[in-house]
């Protein structure tokens, strides 16, 4: 598992969350007017729990609103950004910190290997 995989699954999370929570091995979604079969890796079944843990641990209601709307409900960044009193850079900083915290939880539970962490380039 690497950070790019996590980001890709976060982009389609609203379309696959019911299948993940139902314990299915895959889901069919529509992407670019095509039906696509998405296979779920083992670590993905922890994602809903981690998201809820992060939302419960945060005190900022604006942050929880952003994550619920953009990740869980599947609204676009543009739609969510128009509804919150934040600058664009602050909005994306919140989302980046959320992704980092999710990745750290996967590391803590052993889903990310040392080689995968070292393989990710800093200067890309």
Segments predicted by a language model, with ranges:
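N-terminal interaction/assembly modules
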Residues: 1-56, 109-124
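Short alpha-helical segments used as structural interaction elements across diverse proteins
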Residues: 14, 27, 65, 90-92
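Amphipathic alpha-helical interface surfaces
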Residues: 43, 47, 62-63, 94
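Short helix-coil-helix linker/hinge
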Residues: 54-64
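Short, amphipathic alpha-helical "recognition" segments used to contact nucleic acids or chromatin
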Residues: 62-75
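Helix-turn-helix DNA-binding module
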Residues: 73-90
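DNA major-groove recognition helices of helix-turn-helix
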Residues: 91-109
């Amino acid at each position: 598992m690497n950070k790019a995989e996590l980001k890709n699954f976060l982009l389609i999370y609203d379309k696959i969350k019911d299948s993940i929570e139902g314990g299915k091995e895959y889901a069919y979604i529509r992407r670019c007017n095509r039906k696509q079969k998405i296979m779920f890796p083992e670590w993905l079944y922890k994602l809903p729990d981690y998201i809820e843990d992060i939302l419960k641990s945060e005190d900022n209601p604006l942050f929880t609103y952003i994550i619920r709307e953009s990740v869980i409900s599947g609204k676009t960044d543009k739609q969510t950004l128009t509804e919150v009193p934040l600058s664009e850079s602050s909005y994306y900083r919140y989302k980046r910190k959320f992704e980092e915290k999710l990745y750290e939880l996967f590391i803590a539970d052993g889903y990310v290997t040392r080689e995968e962490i070292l393989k990710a380039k800093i200067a890309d």
